[in-house]
Structure formats: C-alpha cells, structure tokens
C-alpha cells in the first residue's frame, strides 16, 4: 500500500510506471518458444537469482543475450560459493581458484552449499548452464572463462588475507582493488563481449581500461556506502579505514545516535570518492553504438547516481539499507534510453547533492570542486551555450557525444509514440469518468 501512495504523490513517477508496464515495447523481445529445454531452464534460474538483472538481460540484442545471461549465472555461481560461510576454506579456496576449469567439462555440479543458500540451485544445476555455455561462440566462452579465473582467484586471495578478515580494508587503494575484483572485472568482461559483438569500437576495450573499470567501481562503491548497516550486522565492513578513521576510532560507532553527524560526514566523504568515477562513466556510455547494450549499461549507472544522492547526508544509512522509490526506478529506466537523458539525470542528482551540502561538512570545498569539474565536463560534451559565431572545440568527448546523438534520434520516435498512446488513454479515461459523473448526477 505504501508504494501505491508513493506513486500517487509523485505524478511523474506514476506516469513512468504506467508507461513502463503497459506501453513500452522492448527492443528485442525474447521468444520463449525458441531454444532448448536447457536454455529455458537457464533463463528460469536467471529470473530466480535476480529479477532486475533478468529484465534488462532479456531485452539485449540476440547476439549478446545468451552470452551475458550465462556470464551472469556463472559469476553468480562463483559468488554463491564465496558467500557461503558453511563451506570450509579447505574446500572453498581450491574450488574458487579452479572454477574456470569446470567450464571445460560437459557436466559438473556442486551440492555443498547450505540448504538455506538462496542461489544454491545455480550450482546444483550447473550442468544445465554448461550445456548452453558450450554453444556460445568460442571467443565469448574465452572471455567468460578468463574473467571467471581472475575473479575466482581474487576471491580466494581475500579469504586467505588475515589482515582483511581481521580489520577490513585499510587504504583507498585496497578499496579500489577489492572493488576491481568484485565489479571492475565484470565491466572488463562485458566490454570485451560488447566489442567482440561489434557494438563498440575496439578502442573502448583495448585503449580504455579506466572507463570500464570505473563502470564497475562506481556501482560497487555506491552499494558499499548504502549497505553499511547490513554489512555491519553480518560482521563485515568494506568502508576503507583511510576514510572512516577521519571521523571515528571504530567503524561500528557510527551506528550510535551520538555519532550520527560524524557518520554522515564519512558517508559524504565516500560519496566524494565515488563521484571521481562519473567522468569515465559518461565517457563510456557515449562510446556505445548499439541501443540495447547502451540501455543495459546505462540503467545501473543512473540508478547508482540516484542512490548516491539518496545516501548523501542521510543518517538513515547508518541504521538501515535505503533504496530509491520504485516509481523513481521506472522514471530512470525510461529517461536513460538516450545519452542526453542519462546526462540530464546525472546533472539533476549532482545539483541535488550540491544543494544539500552544508558549509560545516569537512569536504565542503572538495565536493563543490568535484561537482564543478563534472559540470564543466558536461558543458564540453554539448557546447550548446556558445556565443553567437563561436565554434565548438572539437574535443574527443564532444565528437563522441555528437556521434552518439545520432543513436538518440532513433529512440525519439518510440518515446513520442508512447507519449501519444498515454495521452490517448488518459483522454479516454477522463471522458469515461466524466460521463459517469454526469450520468450519476
């Protein structure tokens, strides 16, 4: 009931939710009548592990859809092994290090997870995943195997790292390294697949590792900030000591009411660190040349900037995991279909952060400088406010955005058609209710 009330008190979000549910047509709707029983089961497993990821994966271009789906399930299997505290390190560590070798087998499964582990079926039915994995193009298989190898070994290293297990992450460099293994590698693999499918230039993968690394780190750092209370309850922490030690002697002390102000300043410092990836994120999105891949990459990023704005200055983060409204999610999904829409979303939330920034915040100046730097970068993208007669500077990002804008124009007719249908339906509803009201009188 609360979510319904939220929608009706935010009309733009209500409109977006109705459009998304009833009017928007996917670019490449999946055909469930095609494919093997194994493939159908893989998509069922995907739906069970993550409905949100399943929704965006299902709308990918057919060239990439199965590859990305299997990539996700394989990494989910790896993560399910790593997360299960009931598995002995003597079993877990070698399994993580050798997990990529399992991809060479025709059949293999693992039934060693706790019965309460929600995603254990992915491992129990791993032979089903293998059957479809071996149908992928060899180059796609190689990308997935390489990332699985790197991620599995990274996970194993952290399990054996006594310093990490005792005191968490010490430095910002440690923080970046951890985020690389759990999210940066995903950006690496996805970008490699997108490049092999010819949905981006080869340079996006081979020449721009900082861009796809930032795509992963921006998402992971946002989640780490948001999940402070949840992680603390689980007896773990990922906020780096190099940042939190400025505000407390003990990370857990932020959860005490008397330390809420210090905790908020620490949150804002972490937000400042995450904002350092935004320029790379926008540059990456401007480099994509296929619409479904663009939407697949853009949606999580706009959710992340919205979440960063939500956690900024928000002491509730110290007590519970906060989430953006469902209606906001619907609005962002529709708005982020164009690159310009994504940029406008980032601009909106950056303004929101700056508006709520207080002079008392220790990072007041640094946050203002970072946001001003991003404002300037966004101006450079479009250069649409130049004096009469002035020519735009042909910078690399300006040229990227100009090329990307051609793809945005292809999306506009779809948006206009949805708006037309919505207005027609709204007119019909008003007419019907008006007639009923007149008749009742």
Curated annotation (Swiss-Prot):
Cellular component terms (Gene Ontology): endoplasmic reticulum membrane
NCBIfam families linked to this entry: squal_synth
Family membership noted in the UniProt record: Belongs to the phytoene/squalene synthase family.
Gene Ontology MF: a single term: squalene synthase [NAD(P)H] activity
Keyword Transmembrane helix appears in the UniProt entry: yes
EC number in record: 2.5.1.21
A Gene Ontology BP annotation from the UniProt entry: ergosterol biosynthetic process
Pathway info: Terpene metabolism; lanosterol biosynthesis; lanosterol from farnesyl diphosphate: step 1/3
Transmembrane segments: 293-313, 420-440
Catalytic reaction annotation: 2 (2E,6E)-farnesyl diphosphate + NADPH + H(+) = squalene + 2 diphosphate + NADP(+); 2 (2E,6E)-farnesyl diphosphate + NADH + H(+) = squalene + 2 diphosphate + NAD(+)
EC category: transferase
Principal location listed in the UniProt entry: endoplasmic reticulum
Matches recorded under InterPro entries: Isoprenoid_synthase_dom_sf, Squ/phyt_synthse, Squal_synth-like, Squalene/phytoene_synthase_CS, Trans_IPPS_euk-type, Trans_IPPS_HH
PROSITE patterns: SQUALEN_PHYTOEN_SYN_1 (PS01044), SQUALEN_PHYTOEN_SYN_2 (PS01045)
Keyword terms: Endoplasmic reticulum, Isoprene biosynthesis, Lipid biosynthesis, Lipid metabolism, Magnesium, Membrane, Multifunctional enzyme, NADP, Steroid biosynthesis, Steroid metabolism, Sterol biosynthesis, Sterol metabolism, Transferase, Transmembrane, Transmembrane helix
Role summary: Catalyzes the condensation of 2 two farnesyl pyrophosphate moieties to form squalene. It is the first committed enzyme of the sterol biosynthesis pathway. Required for the biosynthesis of ergosterol.
Places the protein is found: Endoplasmic reticulum membrane
Protein name as catalogued: Squalene synthase
Cofactor: Mg(2+)
Membrane-topology descriptor: Multi-pass membrane protein
